[in-house]
Amino acid sequence: QRIKVGGWKEEVWYCYYSIGRAYNLLFTSDNMRNSNYIFHAVHYWMEAYNYYPDRIENLYEIVKLYREQGKYNLAYQFYLMADYQRKHHYSDDHLFHAKSIYDYKLDYELSIMAFYVDVKPTDIHKNIYRLLSNNVIDDTIFNNILSNYKFYTPRLRDLDKGEHPQNKIQDVCREFVKTNPGFSMSTPSIAMTEAGELAMNVRYVNYKINEKGEYINKDKIISRNVMYVLDQQGENLRTSFNVQHDAQYDGLYVGLEDIKLIDNDGHLTYICNRGIQPNKIQVEYGLIEASGVCSSRLLELEHQHPIEKNWVLFKNKNNSSLQFIYNWCPLQIGTFLDKSETNDTRTHNSFISEKHNTPRLFQRVRGSTNGIVVDNELWFVCHVVSYENRRQYYHIFVVLDPENEYKLKKYSQLFTFEKEHVEYTTGFVYNTNKKKFVIGYSTNDNTTNFVDISKEDVDNMFIG
């Protein structure tokens, strides 16, 4: 009756929209047996579009309906109609305006069905990053988006130029494994030394990850680390030695986990995770001498958590001091206390000195590599984990601006190295002359791999 009377366009449109929703509710409450309900629902939603095409809530309902029925091509065509209206006729001055549909729910539908229809990769990546950066999306939808992204994520291995020491290092790793039964080669960390040589730490572990993603541990979880140094051409192994650690903290966890290397004025410096007790992990920081001996200390923050890991180092270009990234949302930058040179009475030996805001996605970002300078910018590789039946690791390039208090400058789309579930990197280097990156990584904690990728290819992965 209200439709027949006419009058205010918003009310008439809302009547069409509501009748469609009522038929859809009948369809779902009838256990989806009577398809006539769906026919009537779509009919009234289309009448709403014909009457007032500027609004898209009705089109969204059709998109969602067909997507849930697996009719992805139909759903996508109605998505395109809704997206066009949203871009060209958007207004929030509507009766009962459903802001969430315009802001993210329509895009969320595309993130689910894009795998089945002809969507340009650049379009789906932009769509997903709008969603992942939206601060009002609830955790359930956010987690679903992250889970679905595995179907769209690029594989960095496909861009590999092959100019890296993978074969040479894998050969020496296999020799280590032969003489140390029960150990597997794992994540390499790499850093360019002041002398222009490539320093590389390879971690060897005594546990396995099975096909279900479960860790198969022995009585003790042991990490052994071997340092390899290649010449300036990266072709010949100049030296290698075992990294020796402070054994006083060995227990269930033995050794240094996830060493991340950085050259600090000719001193090979590292930061790593150190299992102290079954439910206590701290971060260790120190130097690796040419003899393999480490001088180290456990880092302590005021009010730190029982489990601390994934801190990463960088060199502050303004004062040449090493600092660390503690957290990514907000971006928290830490400073070391040198108590030997001060009268500081604090019991901790590091503190958070700066904080900067970052997008929603960075709540999930964790540090992987130490920072390196690339064209006057500070670059990191970080990781994001989607917690599913099997964990899914993604990676992301993050760039900070040294000229603006090390605030976030830009970041890339998420990527994988080989689309394996568990992938990890702890180091990368940049060749200024060749304008390329070499990144070391592992898959499922039982490989030692490298990828060589041009800066141009990486630049094409950045958002915006």
Protein language model features and the residues they cover:
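Start-of-helix register in tetratricopeptide repeats
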Residues: E11-Y14, E57, S100, K105, ...
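Beta-rich carbohydrate-recognition and catalytic domains
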Residues: R157-F183, M192-G251, D263-Q363, V373-H421, ...
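Flexible helix-coil transition and linker loops at the boundaries of alpha-helical arrays
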Residues: R2-V12, L26-N31, E47-A48, R86-K99, ...
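"A position-specific structural signal for the A-helix of alpha-solenoid helical repeats
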Residues: S18, L25, E61-K64, L106-E109, ...
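Single-residue signature of alpha-solenoid repeat helices
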Residues: N34, A41, A75, D123-H125
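Structural motif corresponding to the intra-repeat A-B loop/turn of tetratricopeptide repeats
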Residues: L26, S35, Q69, V117-D118
